[in-house]
Regions:
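Active-site microenvironments in enzyme catalytic cores
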Residues: 1-13, 17-137
């Protein structure tokens, strides 16, 4: 199932994308998938940022080839950093580079969308908190 966020006229909403149609959902899919009865042709809506995150936690230098490419070596512990939630954009929207950025890498990244609050989760249970996945950079 492909869950997206879409804009139609002045409304923004979650939806299910099926072929060339968008099936509108009520509320957020984190609380359960509920169709509201409205459907739109894909060409009539604009796909927007796939989620409305409260925070974005990133892992840097998480594979050897990229760490070597940066000539800084791979850290012993994961390098965590945050990105502002405003950096998420929709399909075919412009990515704005911050003026202060001296180096911006572009790479294909896998985003894991956490669907509910979690703390000190055992590795064997982590999958229970994953809502879905998305493409990021």
């Amino acid at each position: 199932m492909r869950i997206v966020r879409a804009a139609y006229q002045n409304e923004r909403f979650y939806a299910i994308l099926e072929a060339e149609r968008v099936i509108r959902l009520t509320g957020t899919p984190y609380a359960g998938i509920v169709h509201d009865g409205r459907e739109y042709a894909l060409e009539d809506v604009r796909l927007i940022a796939p989620a409305e995150p409260t925070k974005i936690v990133c892992v840097g230098k998480n594979y050897k080839a990229h760490a070597d490419e940066m000539k800084e070596g791979q850290p012993e512990e994961p390098l965590l950093f945050l990105k502002p939630s405003t950096c998420i954009v929709g399909n075919e929207e412009t990515v704005v580079y911050p003026n202060l950025s001296k180096r911006v890498d572009y790479e294909a990244e896998l985003g894991v969308v956490i669907g509910r609050a979690a703390h000190a989760v055992q590795p064997g249970h982590a999958h229970e908190y994953i809502f879905g996945y998305t493409c990021l950079n």
